[in-house]
Amino acid sequence: INLAPSPLIGKNISELGTRFPDMSEPYSKEMIESAERIFNESKICFHKGTYVCVTGPNLETPAEYKFLKIIGGDAVGMSTVPEVIVARHMNMQCFAVSVITDLGIEGKIEKVTHEEIQQAAKKAQPNLITLIKKIID
């Protein structure tokens, strides 16, 4: 779910893609199946869900987390969606993986620093390296 400005605002470069790319199926089912197989074979825990992109650079309030859940979001961040929109604009196949660094669950929300978010992401790095190496092969 994109709640940020579209990266396609401005003059379209038709050599790169159509003005209004179809986003009804932004992620490649084949790539998702490959990633799931790799995660399962590597015994890496994963979950599927709906990602919401916001502008940031602030972290969300409890009320915002609640709103994002109501509209169908399972995870929230400030990236990924613009890159997917651009990839689909260029007719590229893609999928997305996110590292969940903190919980926005009502009653479980704790203050978190950017440094703590970076540490959680760094902890997930070996699993992401495994996925990327195997998906490229």
Model segments located where?
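Glycine-rich phosphate- or other oxyanion-binding loops that anchor nucleotides, phosphorylated ligands
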Residues: 1-137
